[in-house]
Amino acid sequence: MTEMRHGRSRLLRRPIAAFTAVIMALGVSYLGISPANAANANDFNAGNIISDELFYDGYAMSAAQVQDFLNQRVPRCTIGDPGRTAGMTWGNTSIANQCLRNYSMNTVSKAANPYCGAYVGRANETAAEIITKVAQACGISQRVLLITLEKEQSLVTDSWPTVRQIDVATGYACPDSGPNWSANCNPEYYGFQNQVYYAAWQFKVYKAFPSSYGYKPFQTNTIQYNPNPACGTSQVYIENWATAALYIYTPYRPNQAALNAQWGVGDSCSSYGNRNFFMLYSSWFGSPTLAAGTPTGEVKELWTVNNGIRLWGWALDPDSITSPVQIHVRFGTSWAAATADQPNSSAETLYPGSGPNHGFGMWITAPPGPQQVCVW
């Protein structure tokens, strides 16, 4: 829950930031896809960091989608490269055996409780499976858990994490009570499954007992800028449960210097946890403050073919879940449109009662050479 966790903190590193796919037409090579827009820290709204709709969506991603996302963030794990041998001492910890993209562990079962459903453990469960199962059990978005892993320990993008990073993966039970407001983590909650589970569990507890915590939704709160009280406070009207949960978990508001710095370093009173949550979510998944009823969907796959590209996915309007919506695709100076009215079960899984026909598929002519494709 603190701002920095380990000696190689990379929380200020800029991730990929465009809701585009860059491709080579004529079937050459697909260079990459990132499912989000460019982030701007000055769009940060202290009272509404993320909407409840997005935060409490336990079915935002499947395990396969989480795994694909981890693979995109770290195309190659560099543990084992010269100077990065697994088990090698690094500061007061050691280099881990695995990156998050290929991490696995034997998980334990956890009984259902008022905040999370039952979790059935098994041998050799991957990080993607753990993230997905915890999200579904506790009703916290897989995207939120991925962002938490990144803002706390840079685990999503680190190609050679340390044991310490994995032990305190989400910063759960790590209050800023150490020397100079450093993290003071409780070893009882070490371990990847523990950290992911208890972070999600804690987010639900915050909502169940709002009067038990210092920051409350739907009222004005006094929030520090930094763990150092001398840096002062500000008044923030917290607009929803999700934003309150983020402030309870990481109890600081970024100051103007932190926001002006975008992904960089502000001043001695800057804090970055909630700024980075907003920036990472915006960069990776689009706006975190999606209003209820905003059309939503997903490009499931995009690939090159001779003379063009193909893509498919699903989309719907939560205000009218049985009605088809229009999809628009722009590439270069050209654009195309389609109606999301084809068979696809993804929408109905996330929005029961919406029906099976919210899919779309498109073939688009494109000239040779690199193309930037935007879908909305």
Features from the language model and the residues they span:
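Non-catalytic cell-wall polysaccharide-engagement segments
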Residues: 39-80, 173-292
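C-terminal segment of classical bacterial N-terminal signal peptides
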Residues: 16, 25-35
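N-terminal export signals and maturation junctions of secreted/periplasmic proteins
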Residues: 38-129
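Short, functionally critical alpha-helical segments immediately adjacent to catalytic or ligand/cofactor-binding
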Residues: 132-156, 199
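N-terminal secretory signal peptides that target proteins for export/translocation
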Residues: 1-12
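Long, low-complexity serine/threonine/glycine- and acidic-rich segments characteristic of extracellular
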Residues: 292-376
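Substrate-binding clefts and substrate-entry loops adjacent to catalytic sites
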Residues: 113-118, 155-190
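Solvent-exposed, acidic/flexible segments
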Residues: 59, 120-128, 137-142, 162-165, ...
